From Swiss-Prot:
<feature type="region of interest" description="Indole-3-glycerol phosphate synthase">
    <location>
        <begin position="238"/>
        <end position="503"/>
    </location>
</feature>
<feature type="binding site">
    <location>
        <begin position="63"/>
        <end position="65"/>
    </location>
    <ligand>
        <name>L-glutamine</name>
    </ligand>
</feature>
<dbReference type="InterPro" id="IPR029062">
    <property type="entry name" value="Class_I_gatase-like"/>
</dbReference>
<keyword id="KW-0822">Tryptophan biosynthesis</keyword>
<keyword id="KW-0057">Aromatic amino acid biosynthesis</keyword>
<feature type="domain" description="Glutamine amidotransferase type-1">
    <location>
        <begin position="12"/>
        <end position="207"/>
    </location>
</feature>
<dbReference type="GO" id="GO:0004425">
    <property type="term" value="F:indole-3-glycerol-phosphate synthase activity"/>
</dbReference>
<dbReference type="InterPro" id="IPR011060">
    <property type="entry name" value="RibuloseP-bd_barrel"/>
</dbReference>
<keyword id="KW-0028">Amino-acid biosynthesis</keyword>
<keyword id="KW-0456">Lyase</keyword>
<dbReference type="InterPro" id="IPR001240">
    <property type="entry name" value="PRAI_dom"/>
</dbReference>
<feature type="active site" description="For GATase activity">
    <location>
        <position position="183"/>
    </location>
</feature>
<dbReference type="Pfam" id="PF00117">
    <property type="entry name" value="GATase"/>
</dbReference>
<comment type="function">
    <text>Trifunctional enzyme bearing the Gln amidotransferase (GATase) domain of anthranilate synthase, indole-glycerolphosphate synthase, and phosphoribosylanthranilate isomerase activities.</text>
</comment>
<dbReference type="GO" id="GO:0000162">
    <property type="term" value="P:L-tryptophan biosynthetic process"/>
</dbReference>
<dbReference type="InterPro" id="IPR013785">
    <property type="entry name" value="Aldolase_TIM"/>
</dbReference>
<feature type="active site" description="Nucleophile; for GATase activity">
    <location>
        <position position="91"/>
    </location>
</feature>
């Protein structure tokens, strides 16, 4: 039989998959180290086709069963390639190597699934330069026996206490194997071990002297005897190990200058923590039930790497715009690969949404210090895990969290823990379907405990293992008010689509791209009541009044008051209309637009009065602003933060040069509410725009609109070492006011090309002598812009 085409080429690393999901964890680890790995199932080709393979290295993966009955071609491949290329066996792969060379595989004496053991090793071969006592994650019930091991094989590693074989090596050939899983997130120095294997060359240790396998100066590796059961040390559970490490982390943070407990108290007293919202109220306010708590989660002890390229801020914004009520951020660094920075950036990313989700610090909270950290970095709530705390300590941390205005999420896993949470008076209780001591998942846990909170004023949350709408619907029927979803969301190829499917949300309407919209129009440089009223009757949505003294269209405060009085009087004669549209969670600039382009802009309040200023003292802005103007336009080089000091919305002008400069920070949220693009006159010393009739490059403006206000992640998986822009999409076009060049003759084309939110005109509708507005041109401009 000939090989399939994809196996007929030279192969860097061939991995034989023994039908085990861990194969792909191992595959990912190797790929992240730069390896080119080809994976085939152990029944993909017949034994007779093995000699046709052209490979540089062979790996035999983990797998269930016994090597003699369940390993397919693995043993034959080891026999053929031993002495020709480097070979690595993992878990069942080790058992296959031992079996091939004449050893016996038998019951290990204990089933080790997800258990962690420290190991000693011989510091040679793939263990070269690795520290002693490294932690190893074990998933096996079989192992090699020392007494039956053939002379060709040497023991290279054993567990520290039980002396179970964790590594073997052929004495002549470059054949290494480990019983544990180096690719596991809990296994220490796993990448280094795999990296060493990738550096091996040829089929013998003589060809690899740098690995010191044949070095006579090194001492022999002493296996030792298995100690009596009574002296065997207890192996800590994963939960115990995590909590012990978190205590070390907290102690280190407390001792670091700038982050001492006193420092955090001072910062909190200075009100430097972001404003908070009520966690329970946010869950209750969810429009779609159950409320979704969407989690940012890069890795876990049970699953290893999940989405190592995930960007916490972008993921949080994607969740929020898709309908999440809570953003849960893992901040544990060692096993979950999270950080406080992740949480702070996630909070910043959603800070300017009109209905921002609550931020949950998901961590192993064991100290009040961590609660201070959480509040300072923007959390609205923290997780308290009953399984990690004594009842007294739980009460203390719960009360302390409440003292900072944060109602905690209290996590339970069984009836006893639920009783403790209810006694505590917790308002939000989460049931973790995953037992944190062994990380096994039982989806029935929430269902069994739901009855205990029925008829109580408690929001019950399901916290783990949720993968589809069926799981969600089952919990809703049992009274669950919120679901936390992490891994499934992080692995989803389309995050927003998965959330819609999970919560049975219909597809929302387009946010702007490809959607027909009519732009607003503004007539700038109004100088008289007559011009203002004529522009208003023509359908202008905004009128610009120039307060820049050097402008030829400058109006005094007295004249501005007269114009404002005329417009305000006109407004009062119009009926008050409401839009009736439910406000959605939308990005900052999109949310500033009138709902359905109606209400204020199209009806009773139209047109709005805009005061235009340029590099003038704040006192000048504020004098006319409060009683007269609806908006302020900053047309100079004013600091962006100045927008926070005005009592009315602010339009910030971006001065665009012919080469595209001037667009930096166009989409920065939270300061000005609207952005206007105007063209800089070529050769201008001030680099400021306005009043010259210079046309903005419409292609540049179009690209700015299409680039979008925000980019939401399609998937947390990304496509490289970081989540690239190609892995995200702009669902919300950037709303801009297009100035600089539009006039009655070209505004329709400008609208078609750029798709602006509004168009602005000044000199393009003036009389020939520039003394005022040509009212016919004003009417023609509005008509052409709105395609009336």
């Amino acid at each position: 039989m000939s090989l399939p085409p994809h196996l007929c080429v030279p192969i860097d690393i061939l991995m034989i998959d023994n039908f085990d999901s861990f194969t792909w964890n191992l595959y990912q680890s190797l790929c992240l180290l730069g390896a080119d790995v080809t994976v085939i199932r152990n029944d993909a080709i017949p034994r007779s086709a093995i000699p046709q393979l052209r490979i540089k290295r062979l790996i035999v993966s983990p797998g269930p069963g016994h090597p003699q009955t369940d390993s397919g071609i693995s043993r034959e491949a080891i026999k053929y390639f031993a002495g020709k290329v480097p070979i690595m066996g993992v878990c069942m792969g080790l058992e296959c190597v031992v079996d091939v060379f004449g050893g016996q595989i038998a019951y290990a004496g204990e089933i080790m699934h997800g258990k962690v053991s420290g190991i000693r090793h011989d510091a040679r071969g793939c263990f070269k330069d690795l520290p002693q006592g490294i932690q190893s994650t074990r998933y096996h019930s079989l192992s090699a026996g020392v007494k039956t091991l053939p002379d060709e094989l040497a023991v290279t590693a054993v567990t520290e206490h039980e002396r179970v074989i964790m590594g073997i090596r052929h004495r002549k050939y470059t054949v290494e194997a480990v019983q544990y899983h180096p690719e596991s997130i809990l296994s220490e120095s796993g990448d280094d071990l795999l990296r060493h294997f990738m550096k091996l060359k040829g089929g013998t240790w003589e060809e690899n002297p740098e690995f010191r396998v044949l070095d006579p100066s090194l001492p022999a590796f002493e296996i030792g005897s298995q100690p009596a059961a009574s002296t065997s040390a207890k192996i800590p559970t994963i939960l115990e190990k995590i909590c012990a490490q978190r205590q070390k982390d907290v102690d280190q943070a407390k001792a670091t200058p700038g982050t001492t407990p006193e420092d955090l108290k001072t910062l909190l007293s200075m009100k430097l923590s972001p404003p908070q919202i009520s966690f329970p109220d946010r869950l209750k306010a969810a429009e779609v039930k159950p409320a979704l708590m969407a989690e940012v989660k890069r890795a876990s002890p049970s699953k290893g790497p999940i989405a190592m390229n995930g960007n916490a801020a972008q993921q949080a914004l994607t969740y929020a715009l898709a309908g999440a009520s809570v953003i849960s951020v893992l901040t544990e660094p060692t096993w979950f690969k999270g950080s406080l920075l992740d949480m702070r950036l996630a909070r910043q990313a959603i800070d300017n949404l009109p209905h921002r989700p609550a931020i949950l610090r998901k961590d192993f909270i064991i100290d009040e210090y961590q609660i201070d950290e959480a509040r300072l970095h923007g959390a609205d709530t923290v997780l308290l895990i009953v399984a990690t705390l004594t009842e007294k300590r739980l009460e203390e941390l719960y009360a302390y969290s409440q003292s900072l205005g944060m109602e905690p999420l209290v996590e339970v896993n069984n009836a006893k823990e639920m009783e403790i949470a209810l006694k505590l008076g917790a308002k939000v209780i989460g049931v973790n379907n995953r037992n944190l001591h062994d990380f096994n998942v039982d989806m029935g846990t929430t269902s069994r405990l739901a009855e205990m909170v029925r008829e109580r004023d408690v929001i019950l949350c399901a916290l783990s293992g949720i993968k589809d709408a069926q799981d969600v619907n089952t919990y809703v029927e049992q009274g669950v008010g919120a679901v936390l979803v992490g891994e499934s969301l992080m692995r989803a190829p389309d995050t927003r689509a998965f959330i819609r499917q999970l919560l049975s949300i219909p597809e929302s309407e387009a946010k702007g791209k490809g959607k027909e919209t009519t732009p607003l129009s503004r007539s700038c440089g109004i100088r008289t009541e007559e011009e203002a009223l004529a522009a208003a009757e023509a359908g202008a949505d905004m009128l610009g009044l120039m307060f820049v003294p050097k402008s030829k269209r400058y109006v005094s405060l007295e004249k501005a008051q007269q114009i404002a009085a005329a417009i305000h009087s006109r407004r009062l004669s119009k009926p008050v209309l409401t839009s009736g549209k439910t406000l959605e969670n939308e990005p900052w600039f999109t949310a500033q637009q009138p709902p359905s382009r109606s209400f204020v802009w199209r009806f009773a309040a139209r047109p709005l009065l805009v005061g235009v200023f340029q590099n003038q003292p704040l006192s000048v802005y504020l004098t006319p602003c409060v009683p007269q103007l609806d908006l302020v336009q900053l047309h100079g080089s004013e600091p962006a933060e100045l927008a926070k000091h005005y009592p009315v919305p602010v339009i910030r002008v971006f001065h665009v040069s012919a080469d595209g400069r001037g667009l930096a920070d166009l989409a920065r949220p939270g300061l000005h509410q609207f952005a206007l693009l105007d063209a800089v006159l070529p050769g201008s010393a001030s680099a400021l725009s306005g009043g010259t009739g210079t046309t903005v490059d419409w292609a540049l403006a179009r690209d700015a609109v299409r680039s979008g206000e925000v980019r939401v992640a399609r998937s947390a998986q990304g496509d490289g070492p970081v989540l690239s822009l190609n892995s995200s999409e702009a669902l919300y076009p950037m709303p801009v006011i297009l100035a600089g060049g539009p006039q009655p003759e070209n505004v329709s084309e400008a609208v078609d090309t750029v798709a602006p939110w509004a168009v602005d005109v000044s000199g393009g509708v003036e009389l020939e002598d520039g003394s005022g507005k040509d009212l016919e041109k004003v009417r023609a401009f509005v008509k052409a812009a709105k395609k009336l």
